């Protein structure tokens, strides 16, 4: 639409002079009230952009988020930190981007403001929330946040000032595997200028790449930088379809005769116009008649990793490059055409993922009329299946010709809701709602839509029973939509039908039958926005029956008058709405503005509360004469004046939100500004903190239940020393890392509002209270005969549960007469009947709780500095099942203590492993387990029942083997007759089929057997010590524990030493040992007996050798002089005498003989 599009069109409103004056007066009053608010709270806002690692400090730098690989440039800096509590031998990496944070106020220079804020102590606090992934089979389901404090950094631009000219704050932009959607909330630390909190979408764009010139470009097509007015002015708005909270990149088509789309990774804070690189071919045939060809991209759907488009009858998809989700080679190189032989008339989105996958539906015409092509997307891989699998919908509902107009998929129920148009032999057409179950291929006709629109006779709504009267206007359905939380179904066209059970429908008469709904957008938090074919906008609160027109309306006229008076850049007299969509619980418009022949595409908030309030004020007022003048007064239809939530419990136990806190390291510079090195160190610390979180899934529980405990375990005692170094400016690297600045937060306080979601385990309760300050004369007294008076209030609260058979709510009213108020205490409780058991965070049942103050819907508002806020209607999604963040862990600490107590001793392995202590085979093994809550920090003994199975093992860690089902049965079942049992217990309780023992924390313990056919039987020792064995143990409470919805499964290794040998091997070793021992004894005895003889023989041989030597010496020197001869003769005689003496005394030692020979 074009021209004065956003002004009221249609019948001319009565222009009574008094009414014009009153409207003008109302505008002035509201404007002045707004101006007062501005004066009290200066309108300032946060500004956030991305900067690459190497572009920190550059003015005007802004980068796109597509790099996903960690950078290895910070490790060298950590090697410099020798006197710091960190371990420089660990691996520290950095992220490719920083968040650059500034703020601006109206009519003030941003650089001056930031500098002033820094000098007054202002520091931005950044909360990064990672969206959990779709495929929970690959990634862990968790709700993770990290809270960082931004570090001040001087600009690198030249500056003549001594200290600083321009500056900004920076924090690392962390990346987490499995998450491509990131929410950044920026708030103030409470010092300096008041700046309201602001939320930014900072998502990874997997459809960008660098070309050969190092420029960034789109992979899906070519980016256009000139947004021509003819692309947007006067076009019809289109719905924005995507997987809720999971799509990092949104895509919007609908530009006439061009294959252009708008793409954004910031929820249209920034956007790009892209010409898609598709072939734009047109294939017409006898089964796919086409009256003409157009390049327009009609339908667009965005999922976590893949984009879908429809052009004419052709469907294409493109998978982005997301290395944080799957392998790099999964990304598409070009658009892929699917369902090439089909004639596709429409794409239908599926807003919620399920079973680790996302879905999309393609409605066909021609040869496969009556079938739906059901697409499944997982890890970037796309597959389609035609449903129903055998007979078409037409054949199963008993008509010859039918057409599926719309389809909606209820993921949790595996059910397709089909809106079917049937044509009968008399050429009449009727519409039905058909349900098809994809799991069992069941099709059921749910509801026949009436042929004509009912006659409401002045009522707001009408229950369709078949007995009411009808108008002459034919019902023309166009779509069907279901909210999986409250199960509320809408059928829409030139009417609006509502149902909560798929059987009984209510006609909402406030929506005029002269209009036709083009599309609906739902917040899935209780609000619905409707766009008609004439671009009117209507609004509905789910569970109520009043439909409000937002545009055109009296409220809109007042609102736009105020905006134009304030010269807002978000409004113009000539504007065109491109789409209407919800972001969280807020409604936004994407609007093209024309001002002075210049076009601008903006995203703006649709002020629903303001419009309803203005509309109420302009429609209900009184003129009372007070003396000589008239006084204007407004009627307040709200049943209460003040509404507050009280007694709210800590949110983390129910929202399952994990949060870490990380502050930047302290820099040893008097100005307090960081440098590139300190920011890089901050990057490395954030990376290591997230790495500790990711690896904190060990089967053996730490003595302290906290992922950061091991980081500072060995340095806590030196904390004062590190502080001493920092206080004396002697810390290495110029930074001081404070250990207490990196921690996990377990005690978040409630924000005085209901949580974003509630997770309920078996029998869990959630309690809170609503305080309502009533209007005057809101109490009455009631008394029966013989009873005391009781106070009753006109203010009532109703609680609507989507699944009353699964959850229950109780409301207790307390009248506070002295405060003219009522306190309603509400308790929501799980009834323990609607869920079996599931893995933590998997296959949760969706439900909801809606709290409504009777008579308040659309009538009660609260004024805040951020604008009006609707009150009286609260809707909270409820997830029933095993909450995320719970796990089972082996309590090794208590197991060792209890085993030492019961067995009177404890013997560890010879080679001690502190990460895996050993247990002695002959001792009774008493295992204990912990239920650890990663969100709240609670860690307590598992009190439920479980089954323990040995599912693998080996004598060494390198020879571990997983057992098959038959082996697991033989090694663990008390019914085994093959002598293969590994262990046994005196516990008598078993599973229903008696196959396995059921144990608990009170069980008498495990006795190791290792019978002759068990794998641990007859192991060969690896050394002189007894054999060892590693058992792979599985512990599960599946089917045996009724205390929780959680299906806990824990697999861990158990090191057993001191295993006995088999009798044969023991006898063999005994015989060998005895043989060796006997041989050694015999050898010793023989040695002792033969040794003297050996000594004697050796002595005789030596004597003879000496005698021979002496004789040879005599004859050799016979010719020498007389004295020499005499001396020789003397020696010879003495030798003879010595020989005679030896004959007489043979006991003389060998040493004496030698001395005699030398004499």
UniProtKB/Swiss-Prot annotation:
GO terms for cellular component: CatSper complex; sperm principal piece. Residues 1138-1159 are annotated as: Disordered. Keywords: Cell membrane, Cell projection, Cilium, Developmental protein, Differentiation, Disulfide bond, Flagellum, Glycoprotein, Membrane, Signal, Spermatogenesis, Transmembrane, Transmembrane helix. It is a single-pass type I membrane protein. Disulfide bonds join 44-105, 159-165, 288-343, 394-402, 638-860, 806-834, 882-1046, 909-918, 1010-1016. It is found in: Cell projection, Cilium, Flagellum membrane. Residues 36-1065 are extracellular. Residues 1142-1159 have a biased composition (Basic and acidic residues). One of its GO terms (biological process) is spermatogenesis. InterPro entries: CATSPERG, CATSPERG_b-prop, CATSPERG_C, CATSPERG_Ig-like, CATSPERG_N. It holds the Pfam family CATSPERG_NTD. Glycans are attached at residues 102, 177, 355, 426, 574. Residues 1-35 form the signal peptide. Auxiliary component of the CatSper complex, a complex involved in sperm cell hyperactivation. Sperm cell hyperactivation is needed for sperm motility which is essential late in the preparation of sperm for fertilization. Component of the CatSper complex or CatSpermasome composed of the core pore-forming members CATSPER1, CATSPER2, CATSPER3 and CATSPER4 as well as auxiliary members CATSPERB, CATSPERG, CATSPERD, CATSPERE, CATSPERZ, SCLO6C1, TMEM249, TMEM262 and EFCAB9. HSPA1 may be an additional auxiliary complex member. The core complex members CATSPER1, CATSPER2, CATSPER3 and CATSPER4 form a heterotetrameric channel. Belongs to the CATSPERG family. This is Cation channel sperm-associated auxiliary subunit gamma. It comes from Macaca fascicularis.
